[in-house]
Amino acid sequence: NISYFTREWGDNVDDWNSHNSPSRVNRGWGEVPMLVQAQGYAKTDYPYTCYDVLYRNPRQHVGGCLWHSFDHQRGYHPDPFYGGIMDAFRQPKLSYYMFCSQRPAQKNPELIADNGPMVYIANAMTPFSPKDVTVYSNCEEVRLTFCKDSQTQTYHKPQTKEGMPSPIIAFKD
């Protein structure tokens, strides 16, 4: 068996002239494009390398890296590269929180990086926000309540050993 590593994944460019891609999203375009980017990095409905696929690969596949973590000016093309999980000013996009939700929920005092349980509600509740509420979390259970006296919806993480550790949570309208 040969071990291998995917050097670059996630860019998903449709052509190399316009450089358009569902993974190239300016943070200023709003929450819906950023949700599309995060979903593409997490799990796609078509054959493509994504985080879920990396987790489903055999042990000989030791991982992979995104093309670039930050948006930046490229120099060779008039448009900036917008495929980062943070913008050029290091402000997080929604895909950043999707990746944070993949870390273990157990707090590790040995780490200097942010760690432990996390929940991020990826819905701005504007008139243009999706009706379904997307949540990124590494917790076993997440409860969502809209307004004080509203009904609570509860998500229980499935007990599976395949795929990404914490699937994207979608609370339906």
Stretches with model-predicted labels:
Residues L144-K148:
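Conserved aromatic beta-strand anchor motif in extracellular beta-sandwich/beta-rich domains
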